[in-house]
Design a protein with these regions (language model features):
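Short glycine/proline- and acidic residue-enriched helix-loop micro-motifs
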Residues: 67
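Conserved PLP-enzyme active-site core in the AAT-like
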Residues: 2-55, 61, 70-94, 98-288
Length: 288
C-alpha cells in the first residue's frame, strides 16, 4: 500500500476562529432575516461561499510583497509575472488586473458588443454579467448531465459539442468567441476533459472563431484530467496545463483561486489584436 506523504509546507501563522452555539446561530440568522449573505464573517465557522482569496500564502509570497517594484511604468514585478505566466501557459501577451472579473471587464470591453452571442459552459456569474451588461447573450451549452445531481461521470463540466455547433450554425456572425470555464464553477466546479477541449477547438476552428478559457481553476482541472482521463496518468500537471492552453487563444484568470493569492488576476493571449485592443481599457479601468 502506498502511503501519502505529509504536506510539503510548514504552517507559520494561524488565525483563531470561534465555534458558536446553536442558540447563537439561530439568533444571528434571525437578525440577518435568514439571508446568509447578511451574516458577519466572524459568525461563520466554516465559510463555503467561495475559496477565492482565502488561501494561505507562502513566506516567499509575503516577502515578495515587501520587495515588489511598484513603479508606475516598467516595474520589474510585471516582468517577473509575465515570465511565469508565459512559461506556464505559452501565452505571449499579458495584461495584469486586480482580480478575475476585472480581467473580464477589460477584455470584454473590447470583444463583446450589443447583440453578440457568447456560447460556453455555464458562464460564471461575473462572466454572464459582463456579457449581458453589454446587451449581449451568454448562451449555455453545457452537457445536460451537469444538471443531474445524482449522476456520477468523470467530466460533468463539458461543453456539449452538438449545442455549440448548433449555436455556431445559426448565429455565427453574432459570435465573437467561444468561452470555456475550467473547471466549470457554476456547474459545481466540475472538470472539463482534454478530449472535450479538443472538440471545442475543432468546432471553433471550423467556423473561424477564437476560444477563450476562464481559467481560475486551471490547475485543478489539469489534476482531474490526470486522475480521470485515459492517457494522462503519467503526465505532470504542468504538461497537462500547457496542453490545455495550446487549445485556446487566450485566458482570463482570477489568481485568487489556483494562483493562491489574496488578490490578483490577468488576461493572457497569443493574439496581438486582443492585446492591443484590450490594453487601452486596462489603462481606463485598472491602471498602466
Amino acid at each position: 500500500m502506498e502511503l501519502p506523504f505529509a504536506e510539503a509546507w510548514k504552517i507559520k501563522m494561524v488565525e483563531p476562529i470561534r465555534k458558536s452555539t446553536r442558540q447563537e446561530r439561530e439568533q444571528w440568522l434571525k437578525e440577518a432575516h435568514y439571508n446568509v449573505f447578511q451574516l458577519k464573517s466572524e459568525q461563520v465557522y466554516i465559510d463555503l461561499i467561495t475559496d477565492s482569496g482565502t488561501g494561505a500564502m507562502s513566506d516567499r509570497q509575503w516577502a515578495g510583497m515587501m520587495l515588489g517594484d511598484e513603479s508606475y511604468a516598467g516595474a520589474t514585478s510585471f516582468f517577473k509575472l509575465k515570465e511565469v505566466i508565459t512559461r506556464l501557459t505559452g501565452f505571449e501577451y499579458i495584461i495584469p488586473t486586480h482580480q478575475g472579473r476585472a480581467a473580464e471587464n477589460v477584455l470584454f470591453s473590447y470583444l463583446v458588443h450589443e447583440g453578440d452571442i457568447v456560447p460556453g459552459n455555464s458562464h460564471f456569474d461575473t462572466t454572464k454579467g459582463h456579457i449581458e451588461g453589454r446587451r449581449a447573450l451568454a448562451l449555455d451549452c453545457t452537457i445536460d448531465e451537469a444538471k443531474q445531481t445524482q449522476l456520477e461521470i468523470p467530466f460533468k463540466g463539458n461543453v456539449d459539442p452538438k449545442k455549440l455547433e448548433k449555436a455556431l450554425q445559426e448565429h455565427s456572425e453574432r459570435i465573437p468567441f467561444v468561452i470555456v470555464t475550467i473547471t466549470n464553477n457554476t456547474a459545481g466546479g466540475q472538470p472539463v476533459s482534454m478530449q472535450n477541449l479538443r472538440e471545442v477547438r475543432a468546432i471553433a476552428d471550423k467556423y473561424g472563431k477564437p476560444v477563450l478559457f476562464d481559467s481560475a481553476r486551471f490547475a485543478e482541472n489539469a489534476y482531474f484530467i490526470k486522475m480521470r482521463e485515459e492517457g494522462y496518468r503519467n503526465k505532470s500537471i504542468k504538461e497537462i496545463t500547457r496542453e490545455m492552453f495550446d487549445l485556446a487563444d487566450g485566458m482570463t484568470m482570477s489568481a485568487k483561486k489556483d494562483g493562491i493569492v489574496n488578490m490578483g488576476g490577468f488576461i493572457a493571449t497569443r493574439r496581438k489584436d486582443w492585446y492591443e485592443g484590450a490594453k487601452g481599457f486596462c489603462v481606463q479601468f485598472e491602471g498602466y
